[in-house]
Amino acid sequence: MSHSKKSLFAAYSNDDDGDGDGDDLYLEEHQKVTSTNTPSSSWFSNSSYKEKQENVIDTVTSKTQLKRASDFFNLDSDNTFSSPPPPSSSPPLYSKTEKKNNDKVKIIMKKRSFIDSSSDDNSDDDDNDSSSSDQDSSDDDSGGFTYNRKKYKKEQQQQENEENEENERKNRKKEKKKKRKDKKFKNDDKSMMIISNENSENYSDNSSYFIEKTGDKVFSSRTSTPNYNYDNSFILGMSDYKIGFSKKEGYQIEPISLTSFNKQQINNRYFTKPSSSSSSSSQSQQQLITVITKRKEIEEIEKVKPISNIKDPSKSNDDEIKLIVLNENNHDNDDDDNDDDDNETLERKTLKKNSELNKLVEQYPNNIEYWIDLVKFQENFQQFSRNVNKSKTSMYEKQLSIYRNSLLHNPDSEILTIEYLKLASKLWDQQKVLDLWNKVLSSSSSSSSSSIISEKLWKEYIEFCLSNFNDFKIEKIKETIITIIRKMLVKRRSFKVKDYNFMENISNLEESILQFISQLSKLLNQAGFSERVIGIYQSLIEFNCFEPIQLSNETQATLLKEFKSYWSSLDYPKIGNPNSIGWSKSFTILLNNSINNNNNKNNNNNNNNNNNNNNNNNNNNNNNNNNNNNNNNNNNNNNNMDLDNLDNLSIEEIEKLLKEQEDQENQDNENIFNITHKSKDLNEDDDNENNNNNQEEQEDNDSNSNDNDNNNNKFNTWGKKEIELDELKWKPLDINNNLEVNKEVNENDTERVVLFNDFYELLFRFVKEENKLELVFQFLEFLGVPISLLDDKIQPRYSFYHPQRRDSINSIHNENIISLLFKDLKQQPSPPSPSPEYPNWFKTFDKFSNNNNNSQNLLGLSDDKIKFIDSIYKLILENSNGIKLKEKLYVSYIMFKASIDINDAKVYTKSLCEKFKNLIYFDIFASLELKSGKTQQARTIYQTTCFYINQLINQQAQQQQQQLQIDLVYREYLFMELNLIYQTIEKDPQILKRFIKSNHKPIELFFTPLHILQCYLDGNYKQYSSSTFNLNTINQFLNQLNLKFLQKLQQQQQQQQQNSSSSSSSSSSSSSSSSSSSSSVDFLLCYCIFELLSNGFDGFLILFKRITSSSTNDYLKIFSIQHELLTIRCIDMVTKIAPLIGTDPKRIKNLIIDSLNQYYDHPKLLSLFLNWESKNQLINRIRIYFDLNSINNINNNNGGDDGGSSIFWLFAIKFESNRIGAAQRIKSLFEKAISTTQKHNIIFWKLYIEFEINRGRLKIAKSIYYRSIKQLPFSKQIWLLPFTNSKLSLIFNNQEFNEIINLINEKGIRLRILTPKVSN
């Protein structure tokens, strides 16, 4: 037998020298076999998972072992015994288990071609020869050998017994450790790890499978270490695949051939040296063929793409495992390609993505979204540069070039134009950008089409002007907004009645006009011109809501003429003032007086004609005078004729006429103000007072010129007086005949008197009634009445993301209104201010907490302003003919009264119930009693209202509007009872425990709400009694109620389909009919709560998602008013009731987060979220939510178009306001807030500066102040902060004070009193 064909087994069994070289040969060959037998280089094939072959012992003994055996048995060297005894009588040198292992090794080695068949036969022959020779030599001296052999057996058995005992001890210890580990695993996790017994039994006979020990005690003795190189096909459902890992893709399914077979492994897997045998070459060729066939089988398998990560921190971000596909061209370089993919840098990925976006832009140049995505993606390259400032400029230039190319393909795109100009303002000079804006606006306004003006362009232009500090002036902004409004009115005239969606276009345009009016009023008010703003709103409301009936068919010029006479009359106070009666009544009085005057004139003329004969000379003189007067009157009449024919004139001619009138009125007003100082004594007294004041000021300046503290005190007193006058003298001044009131006004301050010329350009009539009501609400919000935050009873007027509503939400600047935002938030105990343990900056946010719980003047309004607002409500509700939708106005008036005095509000609501018999007022009356803490009175009101509903149903068939009110009353009654149950258990949680321990069912808690639902569906209310429900029939009762809800829902859906089909012909009435015919929000809320009580949280969630995700129903379209009300009210009640019926808290939290994804800054949802997470003290979870949404807020990726929300940032700051060590986070929140469109909001800059002052960082506060005046050059409060804050004034010198005052005068900010003059 040659060495080339000698197997490892034969080489070990035949040792010619007998010196133990066979052992060395065995070690060498064993090392080679184990080295070649290692698996591939994948992460599964590391050293800890190799197959253990340490226990493998060969079956043939060597001569050294025989020598050791002869020494052990005391055999002489002269003895002829040279071979071991026969197998039947010789003691075993290994145990039975080792025999089995050797047999298995033989089978494995045969399968893997370690042993040739020929060598195996030769070895068997050698064994037979050796055994026959042993038998021949065993005849001599067998007695001593048998004795020693028995002795050896006993000792061997003792050793085996001791080894078995030690093994049993070790196994017991391992089992105990394993039991301890198994207790840590849950049933779900354990079931994932355990391999089923069926599958393991199928593969137990095959020795090549090493079953995992973890979790399966049957196969625990197979191996001491876990091995993961078993066949995965029965687990994964596919053969020839395994799970791999890479840095780029993570865990992925890859074919075994990808890592197990390459060229080197194929050549060196089974042989350490190249073999010349034909059998080995044929085997290697067959293996290559099998590898190629396996690769061809998996070529067409597609990749499994991962799921995109959800940004919810509470949800898992697990991706699906990818499947790698092998291509035919790169079989040999698979490992190299994977290494390249793993080592692919982030820069390479960004370049790939950038090239893809460039290709999309080239293919679809008219797609604006692709251009914007390409521009925004350029920001990703900034992370690869070391110098951030240089990279920003280069990035801006690159983005500008992309925008230029996009505008070449889309020159009429407003979005691209606006984004281009926004970006240019960051890089170019402001004057250059302003010139470019003027070109854009002139080209857009010169169009002769119906789109003569673009609201978006003008809004962005105003935003640019507010940020352009160098060129900013109040008068410029005012003129710009007025020109925009006039152009929009011209656009409204271009609409024709026959056009499609005529009323919708009119409504949208008028809403845009209201937005510009609101913006103008806020700018003028913040600049100090509050009287002019109030005059504008007064004139618009009088002109639209109190139009005289006699002038309803008159032209615009006639209306302006008559309104001018009414406004300039001194006998009739305007709306808001005491004893105001409105334009309509005052016009009838003026008309009657003019008729009486004409009659008197006619009588006088008759008397004069009788005396003509006696006074001829006098008559001649009088005629001459009369001729002169007639000439003057003719000129005036010509002007009036021009005003009467205003509709026939062009806009330019109208402007000329109005300017002429302005000049005349200005001259008249100057004459009026000159008349006020006729008496010489008053003039002399005033001059003496002024001289004395000037002398005192000069003496103070001389004495305190070197004393900076006194100078600062002067500036502080001046600034505080200026702010006090703004708060006191906010109302316009009426000009009386004697003009005695003007003594309190500065002689140079004529801004307190509002003239007709100050607002005549803004006078126009609204077409839609809803916009007239919105004008009133806008005026009330300007005066300090937050309509949307007063109470939940006031329904929103617009959808959540409507620009008008977003504007009112983001215009919060009053600290008292801010406290109303957090009324639903569970207040944390505020730390004591003098305590040294808490930082000083805590007192910055004291205004956030509403400590005034006595419901007296929650709005913090002054008495004169409360009377002014009350007069507006009364006049509009009692005397207005122009507003027909007064129900919302009544509700807001009740809630305004409740915020001032709740008892007065209850008396007024009771009078409305007796007057109108409206179910809504009954509901409000019950809610006011509930707020007062009178629960039983509120329940009595609801019960009497339900009995009254029974009478209404029996008398006549209820109309649609009446049915909606019935749904409202029952739903409010239901929610009141549920809230009482929740509040009772929240005060004493032991009640619920005692209730459950007494073997009561949770449904028994809600018998009263279920009774209300039964009466609601039956349409017949009955008094609740304890015998109403029976526990034995409760399931049958719930099934009946469920059927009734389903039947009612189907009926309403059928009516909706019929009404929608009938109203499809008339487009004007389609919007109103769809809302009135749909299922009411209150009915759907009752249905959802019933599902929660009867079928648990699962049944409720199915119904809620089915209702809110209905795409066919426009009534419940996402972000609509009805969708918002349904979502907010339903989740509010679910968070209270669902924990009482054993719902998992995590599911409730997920429901809140899903709703916040739709309404990310809703105050109610944010309060619910913070209250829910605060129970578990999970601060990081709340911070993660605000951090993730702040990115969307800054990048304008939320649902709104405003690009920022003041409510969102205020809630984020409020959450951190009472936490020690949160100063840096609050500072970062302020910086993020002012980087959005909230940079023009006063409240953030004001709080930020005060926050840094309380931290003791005055220099930082000073730098923030200079940043604030650059973004808010129109805000008088921001300008005067160094003059009103004593701490901040310490770091300003006299020169800086004087410079600030000069800038205030330059920007056109109004100052009521003279500024102190102090030398630098």
From Swiss-Prot:
Gene3D superfamilies tied to this protein: Tetratricopeptide repeat domain
UniProt feature, compositional bias: Basic residues: 170-184
Recorded GO CC terms: nuclear speck
Biased composition, class Basic and acidic residues, residue ranges: 96-106
Coiled-coil ranges (or none): 146-186, 591-699
Source superkingdom: Eukaryota
Record's subcellular location: Nucleus speckle
Biased composition (Low complexity): 34-48, 598-640, 703-713
Region (Disordered): 1-55, 74-203, 598-644, 676-716, 1056-1078
UniProt HAT repeat ranges: 348-380, 428-467, 864-899, 1221-1254, 1256-1288
Species of origin: Dictyostelium discoideum
Gene Ontology biological process terms in this record: mRNA stabilization; negative regulation of RNA catabolic process; regulatory ncRNA-mediated heterochromatin formation; RNA processing
Protein name per the record: Nuclear exosome regulator NRDE2
UniProt feature, compositional bias: Acidic residues: 14-26, 118-129
Similarity annotation: Belongs to the NRDE2 family.
Entry-linked InterPro entries: HAT, NRDE-2, TPR-like_helical_dom_sf
One protein family per Pfam: NRDE-2
Functional description taken from the UniProt entry: Protein of the nuclear speckles that regulates RNA exosomal degradation.
Alphabetical keyword list: Coiled coil, Nucleus, Repeat
